[in-house]
Amino acid sequence: MSICKEKNGARNENAGAAEYRNIIAVTNRKLCERPFFEQVERICQMHPKALILREKDLSESAYEAMAGQVLEICGRYDTPCMLHSFVEVARRLHHPYIHLPLFLLEEYCGKLNDFRIVGSSIHSPEEAVRAQKAGATYVTAGHVYVTDCKKGLPPRGLEFLKEVCTKVTIPVYAIGGIHAGTGQIQEVMDCGASGGCIMSEMMKI
């Protein structure tokens, strides 16, 4: 299942969508230069493929309060929103899109039938296979390029990404050191990925 498929059909596209339609925005409120919800709305106005609300350091109650507001903003722009880690929050909000670290995905294996889209973060071809077996409908794979988020750690590179893409039949999204407008999105798609994920840049656009 593609992460960009919506129950009510195709999304409208405009000039912003033409640039961002293959980009998944990943949030990190600590990087914002403006109020967080204002930044989320700004991102949605660019019509990315989806948004992952990653603020997993929050308490469950704080995350739920934030998620309710973010889902309302995303809904106004028809931007798919993946909640992150908090499965029960997603259920209480009747939201069928969730993204989980691999260890949580495997813990919940067989217990996520009420979710339409289930993503997972992986860091090796073997983990990608495990994620698909555990029920993931897409994976994010990284880190592909040099990134400040992983200072001192060498990137896994495009050959890693190619191998991941050959090991699974679900969509793969590259993550790590990706910037819009640099040709990197096309580069990762040429490796077989369905697009790329961007955090830092999307928190500052």
Which residues fall in each region the model found?
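Structural preference for beta-strand elements that scaffold enzyme active sites
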Residues: 22-24, 49-52, 80-82, 96-99, ...
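Catalytic cores of alpha/beta
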Residues: 81-96, 123-134, 167-168, 173-174, ...
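Alpha-helix-loop-beta-strand connector modules within alpha/beta enzyme cores
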Residues: 64-82, 110-124, 154-177
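N-terminal active-site wall of soluble small-molecule enzyme domains
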Residues: 50-114
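Active-site mouth loops of central-metabolism enzymes
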Residues: 20-37, 117-121, 178-181
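Glycine/Thr-rich beta-alpha phosphate-binding loop at enzyme active sites
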Residues: 93-95, 119-166
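Glycine-rich phosphate-binding active-site loops on the catalytic face of alpha/beta enzymes
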Residues: 102-110, 140-152, 177-180, 185-205
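Acidic (Asp/Glu)-rich catalytic clusters
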Residues: 40-47, 75-76, 91, 110-113, ...
